[in-house]
């Protein structure tokens, strides 16, 4: 099998690299510094369209990718030089293994590892209408009680769900939307008729 082809799904690759970085920096005790350096790099990457296209392009050699990542990291004003060097080395490893196109997913997965270690979770809430401050607070407190950690709410207003909520935390979802209930009722009625 060639080095440029892998049967491992990319999200799994993202998680493996992210977990490896997290384990290393956790052992060294500098998770916060590395987290800030990762945020600095992601900010530069997300602001620079040319760099974004370069990272996602499969047409550059490993040598070119390593050289560009090293140059980019040298030009970023990292708050902590040592953390910046660790991120730079990590990016060179990613490039050397032909995984640079997965750098967004890897670094975001690293951020999720850090949040999970702090027992911080993001809950995506889809609501038919905006929630009041009191509803947000009650929802947050309820989720924190169930999850056993700090919950950050990411609220999306989507009138097409008609009413109720859809709550997503990690791979779990609770769907109490009126749209889903009506769809279920429609299916049940179709089964009864046929």
UniProtKB/Swiss-Prot annotation:
Localization of this protein? Cell inner membrane
An example of a GO molecular function for this protein is: proton-transporting ATP synthase activity, rotational mechanism
Coarsely, its chief localization is: membrane
Name the coiled-coil region(s). none
Q: Which domain of life is it from?
A: Bacteria
Write the record's keywords in alphabetical order, separated by commas.
ATP synthesis, Cell inner membrane, Cell membrane, CF(1), Hydrogen ion transport, Ion transport, Membrane, Transport
For this chain, the family text in UniProt reads:
Belongs to the ATPase delta chain family.
Q: What does this protein do?
A: F(1)F(0) ATP synthase produces ATP from ADP in the presence of a proton or sodium gradient. F-type ATPases consist of two structural domains, F(1) containing the extramembraneous catalytic core and F(0) containing the membrane proton channel, linked together by a central stalk and a peripheral stalk. During catalysis, ATP synthesis in the catalytic domain of F(1) is coupled via a rotary mechanism of the central stalk subunits to proton translocation.
How is this protein organized at the quaternary level? F-type ATPases have 2 components, F(1) - the catalytic core - and F(0) - the membrane proton channel. F(1) has five subunits: alpha(3), beta(3), gamma(1), delta(1), epsilon(1). F(0) has three main subunits: a(1), b(2) and c(10-14). The alpha and beta chains form an alternating ring which encloses part of the gamma chain. F(1) is attached to F(0) by a central stalk formed by the gamma and epsilon chains, while a peripheral stalk is formed by the delta and b chains.
Protein name listed in UniProt: ATP synthase subunit delta
Q: Which species does the entry assign this protein to?
A: Bartonella tribocorum (strain CIP 105476 / IBS 506)
- Name the gene: atpH
